[in-house]
Structure formats: C-alpha cells, structure tokens
From Swiss-Prot:
GO terms for cellular component: cytosol. Substrate binds at N242, M271, Y300, H336, S356, R357, G358, D397, G398, L399, R400, E436, Y463. The lineage of its organism: Bacteria, Pseudomonadati, Pseudomonadota, Betaproteobacteria, Burkholderiales. This is Phosphomethylpyrimidine synthase. Its EC number is 4.1.99.17. Pathway: Cofactor biosynthesis; thiamine diphosphate biosynthesis. It comes from Bordetella parapertussis (strain 12822 / ATCC BAA-587 / NCTC 13253). Belongs to the ThiC family. Its cofactor is [4Fe-4S] cluster. Keywords: 4Fe-4S, Iron, Iron-sulfur, Lyase, Metal-binding, S-adenosyl-L-methionine, Thiamine biosynthesis, Zinc.
Length: 637
C-alpha cells in the first residue's frame, strides 16, 4: 500500500526500541569553541579487571554515535514536533540566506494546500530558506574562502572520538596506567594507498579537504536538525542505509521507524528511496526527525508525477522536483547525469543490461526522444539550484554492472569519465560532489575501480554499493557485498552503501535494516584498520582485553551489536553466574584456550620464569611423566 491508513500526524509516536540506551552506555558531549557546538558520543562503561588478572581499572570507551537525541534519556522525543534545529543559529548568523513565504515549487504548494493530506502531513511551522540573490551557501564555498564554519569544527571534534580524553583516563587508572595506555593504543601499521591520515583532525584540516573537493559535508540549509558529518577518504569510512516505501509495501510510520532504527545501529546517512504515492509527506517526516543527512533520487518522484512513463519526463518537472526536495531539506541528490545517449549501445552485450533504476529511466528517455539526457545538458542549471540550498551531488552510476559478468566494462568506465567531467563543472560552482560506484565486481577487479575513480574524478569522494563479489547467494547479499565493501573501503572509498539480505528479493524490514547496517559497520571498520586510521584499533584492543579477562558483559557491550552477542551466549549459558565463568559453550571449562594461556602465565609467575620457559619446563615435566608410565601411547582404563 502507498501509505499506512492508520498513520495520523496527531497520534504519531517514536519507536520505543529506538530510544532505549544501549547496554552500559550513556550519551556524552564535547563542547567546542562556542556553547552551541555540542558533539555527541556514546560512552561504554567497563567493569574492572578481575583480581586474578591484575585487578586494574578499565575506563569507559568513547565510540562514534549516529543516533542523535534518540538514545539520550535527557532528551524529550516527540516525532510530531521533530528534532531541535541544531544549526539554525549558524545558518542565520552567516547572513547569506533569506526566509521564503512558503514552498516555491509547484508540487510543494499543491501538497500543502491539499485538504486530503492534512491528517498525515507533518506540521512544520518553519518556512524554507534559500540563498540570497547572488549568494552561494555551500560548505565548499565557505571553505574555499578560508572560512572555518561551526559545522567544520563540530566534525573535527567528532572524528577525533575523544582519544586524548581516553588516553588521559588510561594513564590515571592506576600505577600501571602508562603501560596500559601504551598497550591499548597499540595499532598495526596500515596501507593507506595514498590517503593522508593525520594523527588528529583539526577544523582547518576539515576546511582544506572540503575546499579541495576530497570531502563533502552534506548539510542543506533547510535541514538544521542534522549533526554535521563528513564523507572523505581521509576521514572515518561512513555507511549509508537505504529505506523507502514502494507502491506495494510500507507507509510513513514504518519508514520513520526504519530511519530511527538505522541510525541507532550506525547509519551515517540515510537515503529515502520511496516510490509510492505519498513520497513528499514521507520524506518530510523523515527529514524533520533525522539527525543524519538524508539523500534521495529525485528522478523517482519525477517519474511518479508522469504516472511512471519515462518518455513523458521533462526538464521542467525534474527542476520543480529538485526545488521541492531542496526546500524540504534533502542533503544530497543522486543524479544520473552520466547516462548519455552514446553510452547506451555499449550495454547491449551485457548479461544484465542496465540495472540502476535511475539509469534505466534516463536510458529509456534518451531512446524515446533520441536526444541527449536533459540531466547532462542542463547540468549547470542544476548546479545553480544546488548551491542555493547547499545540496550535495551524489553523481549516480546509472550504468553500473549488475553482475560480475558485466564488471569494469566499456559502458561503466565511459560513464565514470563523464562523472569526472561533471565534477569539475560542479566545483566551478563550489557545489559539493561525491561519485557513486558499483555494483557487482569480482574481488580481483575491485582495485581498478578505485584507481580509475581517483584518476578521472580528481579524488572526489567515492560512494559504492558494495560491491557484490559473487552473484550466487540471494538472501545473503549483505555478505557477498560486505566482502567487496571492506576491500574498496580499504582502497579509498569514503562511504559504503549498505546491502541487506533482501537485496534483489524484496523491501527490507527492520531486522534486514539492522543486519545490513551491522555488516557494513564491520566492513567500514575493517577498512579503517587496514588503512591505519589513527585510533581505529582502540575498540578492538579493549574488546580483546575483555575477552581474555572473561568480562562477558563488556565483550557484549563493546561490540557492534550487544543484543545479539548476549542472545547467542545465553542460548547455552543463560544464568548470571555464567557471565563470570572462565569458559563458554564452544570449548567448555577444560579446553578454553584463553583459560589455558592464563594458567600458563600463573604457573610462570609462581615459578619465577618467563612464559616461554614455563612452557618448556612443563613439556619436560610431561616427558618425564610419559617415560615413567612406560612410554606407552595408549593406556587401558
């Protein structure tokens, strides 16, 4: 169905599961140079090390937090009002925007005055903004003029993850604090493939990366609710979660719920890919309640306006859709301007043809009119709209391969070169750009994608869907793609678009969203570790220490999904007493490798020898015992 008939604005409620704090976690904030720069983090409490393992303190660990106010018990959440306008003062004080009387798009006006929509409409009292005549309000424009915005300072604090605070608490944790700090901050050298990864992120570094075009800050002036974040290969690898209704499934309430669920588990951005009848209203509810950037594919809604007939699309309809969505607050648009008429014949010999919805829409339009795409021909006009609201481009890969068979072919790379050319056009207008990538690519062919993207697109951030490394696993494509995502993230991709188990099969539900998010958080973190991102190993080291010390609850809570970890453990060892046991059900009490290792260490300490000598001594003792018992391999019992 197109909209849930039970959804009424007056009775809309937040998903209770999305607002509960994660186990042993609390929301903490770091304040910047001004009191309204308050950067949120999640702090995970840890138990002390048991006395038999040394009895030391384990300070709380800070992790990146995308959940916004939802997991803060001090926050009052009412999705009917939306989130606080965190950035309003920052936008207003720049003095380069004007408040409009109301929506200026034809469609926006039509929806606002339709009485049939009153019961489901979000009651936004705030009119939209637009750049003043002749002004440019993009973060890139400010960056290129040497301005460090509050958004940039916010991001610098956020990316550093309070590492200095953690170091100080480790050092102050006890007499061996310095030793503990050195141990827990240890990290293997990475291979960054040319990425520049400073030991600490400064606001000036953020400004430089945005000015250069190597990073983007998706932050529409009409989405003041967002907590600023950055996408770029010299920063933490980010992930995107796709949500959205269709003509046959889901409604407004479900999509808002999916959004809050996605950000709870780590979605850095969310794309609303709704294709049903109430796209406009669904998007408004999502944006007003989202602390993360929201992306869309405007051609989907434009197609709905012509009853799904691609050949009837016009520039005027598309332009009105861009303005409509920009005034709602969409932070980035996927626009398939690289699907050009000359490239379409290149897909003729493909196994799976054109699999991108946006790409196929534009290919059909080009063939129906035998004309160049209006997205390509009107690209500079699109840039004028983007810079009036600070909407970032996500230049779509409409010719991405839909199977390993089609990977790295002529059509894919012809489009990539065009996206590089369009990037230069957008940058001329100081419009922020990231480039979308494949798709389905076998592992040995992934690196070429990254290398060519850096070459053709002048290091603009790469944003990839996977890629899926094999085509044989419907129902498990979060895994087939997670493999490729980890690799391409290591090579330099800045943001990974998640794939859920339902990929190619159906619309994902809440469980699928979580499965996709966790899979891609693993891929992104693995990429950060492989690149050698400063501090990336801290959480791994803390969890490994907890595991060796049999601090079961800390193991669960330091992980990406505490609920599932605890559930799996409790299936066989459910009692509270088992949370302090020195074994799990995998090996049992007598064969736990970590317990055996600890026994060796205890023996070494008692004998006053090294662990190596203790092992050798133990082997000699067993050899003597073997000979005394007759040197028989087997004994009858």
């Amino acid at each position: 169905m197109n909209a849930n008939p039970k959804f009424l604005a007056a009775t809309a409620e937040v998903d209770a599961a999305a607002v509960a704090p994660l186990p042993k976690s609390r929301k903490v904030y770091e304040t910047g140079s001004r009191p309204d720069i308050r950067v949120p983090f999640r702090e995970i409490e840890q138990a002390d090390t048991p006395t038999m393992f040394g009895g030391e303190k384990n300070p709380p660990l800070t992790v990146y937090d995308t959940s916004g106010p939802y997991t803060d018990p001090q926050a009052s959440i009412d999705i009917r009002r939306g989130l606080p306008a965190l950035r309003r003062a920052w936008i207003e004080e720049r003095g380069d925007t004007e408040v409009l009387d109301g929506p200026t798009s034809d469609y926006g006006k039509e929806r606002l005055t339709d009485p049939k929509l009153t019961a489901m409409r979000f009651d936004l009292q705030r009119p939209p903004r637009r750049a003043r005549a002749g002004a440019n309000v993009t973060q890139m424009h400010y960056a290129r003029r040497g301005i460090v915005t509050p958004e940039m300072e916010f991001i610098a604090l956020r990316e550093n993850l309070r590492r200095e605070h953690y170091l100080e608490t480790l050092r102050a944790s006890g007499p061996d604090g310095e030793k503990l700090a050195k141990r827990l901050l240890r990290q293997h050298p990475g291979q960054s493939f040319g990425a520049a990864l400073p030991s600490a992120i400064t606001p000036e570094f953020v400004r430089e990366e945005v000015a250069r075009g190597r990073a983007i800050i998706p932050a529409n002036i009409n989405h003041p609710e967002i907590e600023p974040m950055i996408i770029g290969r010299n920063f933490l690898v980010k992930i995107n979660a796709n949500i959205g209704n269709s003509a046959v499934s889901s409604g407004i309430g479900e999509e808002v719920e999916k959004m809050t669920w996605a950000i709870r588990w780590g979605g850095d951005t969310v794309m609303d890919l709704s294709t049903g009848k109430h796209i406009h209203e669904t998007r408004e509810w999502i944006i007003r309640n989202s602390p993360v950037p929201i992306g869309t594919v405007p051609i989907y809604q434009a197609l709905e306006k012509v009853d799904g007939k691609a050949e009837e699309l016009t520039w005027e309809i598309f332009r009105d859709t861009l303005i409509e969505q920009a005034e709602q607050g969409v932070d980035y648009f996927t626009i398939h301007a690289g699907v050009r008429l000359p490239f379409i014949p290149m897909t003729a010999d493909r196994m799976t043809g054109i699999v991108s919805r946006g790409g196929s829409i534009m290919a059909k339009w080009c063939l129906a009119h035998h004309k160049e795409s209006f997205l390509y021909e009107r690209f500079e006009e699109i840039c004028e709209i983007m810079k009036a609201y600070d909407v970032s481009f996500s230049l779509g890969d409409g010719l991405r391969p839909g199977s390993g068979y089609d990977a790295n072919d002529e059509a894919q790379f012809a489009e990539l070169k065009t996206l590089g050319e369009l990037t230069q056009v957008a940058w001329k207008h100081d419009v922020q750009v990231m480039i979308e990538g494949p798709g389905h690519v076998p592992m040995q062919m992934i690196k070429e994608n990254m290398e060519l993207q850096l070459k053709h697109c002048d290091e603009a951030p790469f944003y990839t869907l996977g890629p899926l490394t094999t085509d044989i696993a419907p129902g498990y494509d979060h895994i087939t793609s997670g493999i490729g995502a980890a690799l391409i993230g290591w090579y330099g991709t800045a943001m990974l678009c998640y794939v859920t188990p339902k990929e190619h099969l159906g619309l994902p539900n809440k469980k699928d969203v979580k499965d996709g998010i966790i899979t891609y958080k693993i891929a992104a973190h693995a990429a950060d570790l492989a690149k050698g991102h400063p501090g990336a190993a801290i959480r791994d080291n803390a969890l490994s220490k907890a595991r060796f010390e049999f601090r079961w609850d800390d193991q669960f809570n330091l992980g990406l999904d505490p609920d599932t970890a605890k559930e799996f453990h409790d299936e066989t060892l459910p009692k509270d007493s088992m949370k302090v046991a020195h074994f799990c059900s995998m090996c049992g009490p007598h064969f736990c490798s970590m317990k055996i290792t600890q026994d060796v260490r205890d023996y070494a300490a008692a004998q006053g020898v090294s662990e190596k000598d203790a092992l050798q001594q133990g082997m000699q003792e067993k050899a003597v015992e073997f000979v005394k018992k007759g040197a028989e391999v087997y004994h009858r019992t």
